[in-house]
């Protein structure tokens, strides 16, 4: 909502809806005027996708109503973000010839971009964003700024982010059901990246891993360009499921995890025990701090494995000069950055949007759990300054491509695909980026770049794969019962 100089952004997560109202200060910082976090009840959102529109709409309404009452305003418009395992990233090349002589002009760059926007998207999908990579002049010279260079042919490979039409429509329906018009739709992963990164990190090479409840979003930057976006259909909820296996009531699991949990078993106190209420006073449950940490560590390592796989698919995993930035609700667990660093050998830090917040908002809005919502505000202000609008049905290819032609570089659609991919890797039959037509070159070299510094895994990979498959099957059963 744009009224009185402020904007409203709504982040729809698997577990919570985060609504924020913010404005931009004269020095370019975001000032948060109000915020509200509302829990998504039941299975309203599953791995980032709306499954029950009534439950999600009610959560939106709860968050928005609370802000309206405190601020004395009426919210009728908002910017929002999207995630989910339906999101996929593909690469598409295109070129144009110089319009005048042998010099590349701004109009040639504009024509190149417009050409990518004026063709139909594959059936059942919409384009969320089109991101040009480096430009190539006459098939030889590569440059980030082609205007003013000499040449006859301007080419680029575009990183195209696609989303499922049904999932996008459901998100917009959930907003409209509570009388909120969607002003713009952004990819959560990119919004989070904009919120937590510095310009130097984007230039040197960095990966942002946003650990949510149902999904983990991964975005890779290099030379200040978004090189890859991937969605892992696994988040902090897998930790909750294992904690429940100790007999802990579901309503106590999240608070137990966030208040007492640690991401490294060795850091937990060996003689500490936590007691939680049971169904009756006599049925209280007890769990040791080390067992709780062991559960968290095991599941976090699973998430890290798949996040690293997405980073490797970018072809830039050995060029991350600034390491990895962890954010999202799952990044608030103690020692998660140390676990990541010790396991992968990559530098890692946990961050919220502090570097982009006004000083008055640091204490109230600096949490990693608010990163995406603040990033949505930043993207909205950026596009408004450029007089841009979000086109949610941008086209894809100059020669309309089929889904089959595009799917080889897409994000895996569900955990069964991840299971099979991991199994192939362990059997030595799966290649890396280069093995499936990627741009990465030697697969074995790529695999060892990150894993050379890994510590030995704490558990057998086959047991993990079986648990992962069981997790997917249980989720499918629960979805069918709702």
Enumerate the language-model features and the residues they cover.
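Nucleotide/phosphate-binding catalytic cleft detector across ATP-hydrolyzing
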Residues: 1-16, 20-206, 249-250, 255, ...
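Residue-level signature of catalytic and energy-coupling elements of molecular machines
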Residues: 9-10, 19, 80, 175, ...
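A short acidic Gly-Thr/Ser loop motif
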Residues: 10-16, 82-83, 200, 208-215, ...
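Short glycine-rich phosphate-binding loop at a beta-alpha junction
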Residues: 74-84, 314-329
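Glycine-rich phosphate-binding loops at beta-strand->alpha-helix junctions
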Residues: 163, 262-264, 319-343
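Adenine-nucleotide phosphate-binding core of ATP-dependent small-molecule kinases
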Residues: 177-184, 275-317
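Short acidic loop-to-helix transition motifs that present clustered carboxylates
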Residues: 187-194, 238, 355-358
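Glycine-rich phosphate-binding/hydrolytic loop that grips phosphoryl groups
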Residues: 352-403
